[in-house]
A protein has these predicted regions:
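Ankyrin repeat (ANK) tandem alpha-helical domains that serve as protein-protein interaction scaffolds
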Residues: 1-135
Length: 135
């Protein structure tokens, strides 16, 4: 049986839904905000956002956070995965789902992640992801 992480990374949403009990157990074991010292790659929302199929990555992210009640403090892990996979749709969705006062920090964090993954032009990508996709 594939690991739940691999199922998320591959965007196998139907398989993921069949394994809801495992997701619930993972959620139960996640440290509280402030105590969460895991690496980005240790979080299944990173795996979902890192999915090569960007549409499935977005749908998997929505499933984890909206239907399964995945902890909101873990969204940073998903943001890192979305930046690494260049998932503009998911970045746009995340940006539009946060409070206004968090948006400036979010843009800075995305830019930092894109730079760390050697994106040739982070500011153009961010402009596309956050503003062009709205149109």
């Amino acid at each position: 049986m594939k690991s739940i992480w691999k199922v998320c990374e591959n965007g196998e949403l139907d398989e993921l839904k069949k394994r809801r009990n495992e997701i619930d157990q993972i959620i139960e074991d996640i440290p509280n905000d402030g105590d969460d010292m895991r690496e980005d790659e240790d979080d299944i929302s990173f795996a979902a956002a890192y999915c090569k199929d960007h549409d499935m990555g977005l749908e998997t992210f929505k499933y984890l956070y909206e239907e399964c009640g995945y902890p909101r403090h873990c969204v940073h892990y998903a943001m890192v995965g979305a930046a690494a996979s260049r998932n503009a749709k998911l970045i746009n969705y995340m940006y539009n789902d946060i409070d206004e006062h968090e948006k400036e920090n979010f843009i800075g964090d995305i830019e930092d992640e894109l730079v760390m993954t050697d994106h040739p032009n982070p500011s153009v990508f961010i402009e596309y992801a956050l503003f062009e996709l709205k149109k």
